[in-house]
């Protein structure tokens, strides 16, 4: 039959016939369409299987038995002794591993990747802070100290190994508000090219029992994975105040969180690529356990700027602004005795507003003096209010 068909084609087939060419093109088009429909059908079959398949149960490996079975703690409740699927390498299983179990046979069919808490992950600063040492005025001594303690061990650990000393694990920055403690930490992170993990200590104080300690533990696990890294804990007095026996559940939870923090600090080797910086305005209320050798070894005071420091801070901020060129930095520094770096920044910002109100596109000396007087009046009013409330 096939020979007869081939013979018929040989006699009657004419490839130059336009009708034949049209039919060939049509057949080719239909063949391609059929292939695409088959692919779509296979895709829909796969999706249907996924929709109908029962979900897996998440579990944590507790122990591996000699006979190859595994003890797991199921997310649904009880501890189970389960088998391991043949396509799973049992060497990959270890206590603490996350695995997936089938619902019916409770067999381990997949090893899950380590899970990162989204709340903890949000502490990591993805983009490096755009703050450099040149942006900080009046703190040259503090900059040199923090570079020796944080930056040098991260960049040149071999120096410490060769001499045979251990660099400090952590640095505690203390001083009045607005003196540049956070700026120092950001500048170190920028200059050392380390992952910067910033957290306010009050975020460790959680509502539920054990939650704060868990977050502390996971923050330091994140720091180890992202090493070299710097963990910056701002306002550490929120959880690091001296422990007192008040008996309230909230106080006990804060104490548990503090003990977890101390345990994590003690767990680091000095030359690990993880450094800790903490900042506080209240050194006097911190628990002595935080300040003992081996934890926050180096205490760096960040005081209010002196005369030369205030001049330098004014130069840093005013060089970014448009001025008339007749700025007397010595006069500005003498008028702002007792001002912090943050207050000097407020003076420059207020001077800019005064210039805008007066219809100018630049700042002059008069604007700055007016701004200083305004900030002083505001500070005096706040002090008088505090004094009045104290004796009411």
UniProtKB/Swiss-Prot annotation:
Keyword Chaperone belongs to the record: yes
Region (Docks into pockets in the proteasome alpha-ring to cause gate opening): 390-392
GO BP annotation list: proteasomal protein catabolic process; protein unfolding
Coiled-coil residue windows: 19-53
CC annotations in GO: cytoplasm; proteasome-activating nucleotidase complex
CDD domains xrefs: RecA-like_PAN_like
The organism's place on the tree of life at top rank: Archaea
Assigned protein family: Belongs to the AAA ATPase family.
Subunit structure: Homohexamer. The hexameric complex has a two-ring architecture resembling a top hat that caps the 20S proteasome core at one or both ends. Upon ATP-binding, the C-terminus of PAN interacts with the alpha-rings of the proteasome core by binding to the intersubunit pockets.
Protein name, entry field: Proteasome-activating nucleotidase
Gene responsible for this protein: pan
């Amino acid at each position: 039959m096939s020979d007869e068909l081939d013979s018929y084609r040989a006699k009657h087939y004419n490839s130059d016939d336009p009708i034949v060419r049209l039919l060939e093109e049509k057949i080719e088009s239909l063949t391609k369409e059929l292939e695409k429909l088959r692919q779509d059908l296979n895709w829909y079959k796969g999706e249907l299987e996924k929709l109908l398949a029962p979900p897996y149960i998440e579990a944590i490996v507790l122990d591996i038995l000699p006979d190859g079975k595994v003890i797991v703690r199921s997310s649904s409740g009880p501890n189970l002794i389960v088998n391991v699927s043949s396509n799973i390498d049992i060497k990959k299983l270890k206590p603490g591993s996350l695995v997936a179990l089938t619902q019916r046979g409770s067999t381990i069919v997949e090893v899950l990747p380590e899970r990162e808490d989204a709340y903890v992950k949000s502490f990591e600063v993805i983009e490096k802070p755009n703050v450099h040492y040149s942006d900080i005025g009046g703190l040259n001594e503090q900059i040199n100290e923090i570079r020796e303690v944080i930056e040098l061990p991260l960049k040149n650990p071999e120096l410490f190994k060769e001499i045979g000393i251990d660099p400090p694990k952590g640095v505690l920055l203390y001083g009045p508000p607005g003196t540049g403690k956070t700026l120092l930490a950001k500048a170190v992170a920028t200059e050392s090219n380390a992952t910067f993990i910033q957290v306010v200590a009050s975020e460790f104080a959680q509502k539920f029992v054990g939650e704060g300690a868990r977050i502390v533990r996971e923050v330091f696990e994140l720091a180890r994975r992202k090493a070299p890294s710097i963990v910056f804990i701002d306002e550490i007095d929120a959880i690091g105040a001296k422990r007192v026996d008040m008996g309230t559940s909230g106080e006990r939870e804060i104490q548990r969180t503090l003990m977890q923090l101390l345990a994590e600090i003690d767990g680091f080797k000095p030359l690990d690529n993880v450094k800790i910086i903490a900042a506080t305005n209240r050194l006097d209320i911190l628990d002595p356990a935080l300040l003992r050798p081996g934890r926050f070894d180096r205490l760096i005071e960040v005081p209010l700027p002196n005369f030369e420091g205030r001049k330098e801070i004014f130069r840093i901020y005013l060089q970014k602004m448009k001025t008339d060129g007749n700025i007397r930095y010595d006069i500005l520094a003498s008028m702002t005795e007792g001002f912090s770096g943050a207050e000097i920044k407020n003076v420059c910002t207020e001077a800019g507003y005064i210039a805008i109100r007066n219809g100018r596109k630049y700042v002059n000396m008069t604007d700055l003096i007016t701004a200083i007087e305004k900030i002083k009046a505001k500070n005096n009013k706040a002090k008088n209010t505090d004094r009045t409330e104290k004796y009411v």
